[in-house]
Amino acid sequence: MSSDSMRNIRNFSIIAHVDHGKSTLADRIIQLCGGLQAREMEAQVLDSNPIERERGITIKAQSVSLPYLAKDGQTYHLNFIDTPGHVDFSYEVSRSLAACEGALLVVDAAQGVEAQSVANCYTAVEQGLEVVPVINKIDLPTADIERAKAEIEAVIGIDAADAVPVSAKTGLNVQDVLEAIVHRIPPPKPRDTDKLQALIIDSWFDNYLGVVSLVRVMQGEIKAGDKLQVMSTGRNHQVDNVGVFTPKRKVLPALRAGEVGWVTASIKDVHGAPVGDTLTLAADPAPKPLPGFQEMQPRVFAGLFPVDAEDYPDLREALDKLRLNDAALRFEPESSEAMGFGFRCGFLGMLHMEIVQERLEREYNLDLISTAPTVVYEVLKTDGTIINMDNPAKLPPVNHVEEIREPIIRANVLTPEEYIGNIIKLCEEKRGSQIGINYLGSQVQISYELPMAEVVLDFFDKLKSVSRGYASLDYHFVRFDAGPFVRVDVLINGDKVDALSLIVHRSHADRRGRELCDKMKDLIPRQQFDVAIQAAVGSQIIARTTVKAMRKNVLAKCYGGDVSRKKKLLEKQKEGKKRMKQVGRVEIPQEAFLAVLQMDNK
């Protein structure tokens, strides 16, 4: 395809931290370009998932194609790919950026630059994108445009002299943003081959259409009736329809080079069009696939079990469909003595885990129990083999373990100066070691290496509370480090409950064991017999507590009378309780499994 026909195409996405007004700016751009009538407009048009709306965050990448009549009299085709801002979804961002030539960096004029925008902006610069800074929320009384510009230059290191000040809420200067997109972001470059290459940015399952793929056509064109080949699997599929989102789904005769749109090809197998794959024509395939994306490795694992065992096949199907839409989700079947059959699932972080569980419960009407999340440990066995362990119950016997290594992450925290003390104290409590502190204008960047197990549970919430919500966090995995780790098991009446096991640092084992026993005592209902709750490391019991039995007052019918008669009745009751304890089983409520999560939140 000639560079002439691509000259008026602009592919861009928006990079911003959570809550800096990215979705609102997208709404204004859609409105200005006439994508939707005023009566059809609603807040957060592209956040179509109800969970996205409620939490006010973007989870999935969405795309929209808009015609824009610029001041120079030419009509440009703007393809906008929405990106999430939360650290757990950074892989979604890199996928969206791979399909663009430019990005808008949106910074809140009142809050300044935050850590997640920095990380995503570096990704954009590495991929060679043109970054256009936009300073949003200038209608706020606390807005300080000059400070925001200075921070963009100091923290990110890109020139902010031509940053566009806007208010997405009132629509002020949004036209200037569109002009900046047209004049500063380059058009797509033609490739050296004319054979079809299209990158799959995203896929989702539609009950009527099968798999719908969002693609960026790099070279060639796709039209209905073409036979496409998925390059990684070698399978062929016939195209039913192609088109774009405006944001409504609109069918087009063909998608040409440089364009972003959707393709349906009646693919019923949910693994038929993997994200990051390349589509080409079966009759005339491209010599090699496009460079895809990095595979994201899940960092947090948890068991998901259906409350009703009959829902197991439905849970498998729901996870399959969700996996298509969420490339970072991993799962494999797992069985637990306490919970029955379910799946061990891998997530990118706690927010990712919460959202997957919420989507399964809402979109697929499943009732689920989740076990406490754990991170992946590396275990060096005495015979020299190394295994990756994502479930504490699978730790080999102590005499077979040479050492246990935990994952370490590098965390970058951006915070206003006055909260440095609180944040350093929090990081030290979490066994962190400081790498460095940089003063950047009024902001401070603190770098720490922290054990991932400490970060996964509640570090993000605590960071927000010690900094009154001003600090922001970005982290990435660095390496595995050996340490003195032990597995704490929970025994209830002498039976080990595998779903409650956890791996902890030896120095914390006694405290965690005591806390867990006390928590269990509050949550396990009283039975007709004593229930012993113990925490053990190997064969050594480190904590114990007892849920006392409920007793009937067997002396109620004795008015006065001989003491030996009373003793006889009490002894008889005692014998009965003893027999009951041998055969009785304790039902453990769901709250008890979640207790492991809330132990640090006291």
Swiss-Prot record:
It is found in: Cell inner membrane. One of its GO terms (molecular function) is guanosine tetraphosphate binding. Its EC number is 3.6.5.n1. Keywords: Cell inner membrane, Cell membrane, GTP-binding, Hydrolase, Membrane, Nucleotide-binding, Protein biosynthesis. InterPro entries: EF-4, EFG_III/V, EFG_V-like, EFTu-like_2, G_TR_CS, LepA_C_sf, LepA_CTD, LepA_IV. Residues 7-189 form the tr-type G domain. One of its GO terms (cellular component) is plasma membrane. It is a peripheral membrane protein. It catalyses: GTP + H2O = GDP + phosphate + H(+). GO terms for biological process: positive regulation of translation. GTP binds at D19, H20, G21, K22, S23, T24, N136, K137, I138, D139. PROSITE patterns: G_TR_1, G_TR_2. SUPFAM superfamilies: EF-G C-terminal domain-like, P-loop containing nucleoside triphosphate hydrolases. Required for accurate and efficient protein synthesis under certain stress conditions. May act as a fidelity factor of the translation reaction, by catalyzing a one-codon backward translocation of tRNAs on improperly translocated ribosomes. Back-translocation proceeds from a post-translocation (POST) complex to a pre-translocation (PRE) complex, thus giving elongation factor G a second chance to translocate the tRNAs correctly. Binds to ribosomes in a GTP-dependent manner. NCBIfam families: lepA, small_GTP. Belongs to the TRAFAC class translation factor GTPase superfamily. Classic translation factor GTPase family. LepA subfamily. This is Elongation factor 4. The gene is lepA.
